[in-house]
Amino acid sequence: MRGFEERFGYPPDDNLVVAASRPGGAVILRELGGRVPSGVVGFFDAVEEISLPDVWNGYFLGPVDRVVGAYADESPRFITVEGDVVEVLTIGSDGGGALYCVCMEEPAPVFRLDQASIRGGVATAPPGFTRQIAPDFSGFLEALARAVESSEQGREQPPF
């Protein structure tokens, strides 16, 4: 990460994209009964996890076992969006406690959920703290790539 140490006064941590050592998409399909968005399945077939602690506040996706575990533990399994309760899969988080959740139904929009309380598997956040950040999973990955680029360029505000 060019210029990181000059900007922050310490060297960057390990920022990693770890290739899958097993077909993680198949694991998710098996554990969740085949109801997972196709983009998520394809992603975890190729990537075990993404760990970017030095990009903005940090971005963390996966690993598969954590994603499946969060769903099984209902942490959360549903979110409230504009008064509707929708089923989600929590695919990651940032370093500040926000969760990234993808809707289980296609086109599978991705939401950033911040300051949420979880009761009975349903996450509820204060008004304005559940925000759709991408229309689908591939759009989320594109936005994440832009976040990495803007962080490396030293921009002031993260895109999400």
Where would I find each of the regions flagged by the language model?
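A surface-exposed partner-binding patch
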Residues: 1-99, 152-160
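Short, flexible beta-strand-to-coil junctions
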Residues: 47, 92-96, 104-106, 113-118
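Helix N-cap / beta->alpha transition motif
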Residues: 60-63, 103, 127, 136
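A generic structural signal for beta-strand entry/edge sites
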Residues: 88, 107-108
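Short helix/loop capping segments that flank catalytic or ligand/cofactor-binding pockets
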Residues: 99-102, 111, 121, 141
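Compact, glycine/acidic-enriched structural inserts
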Residues: 116-146
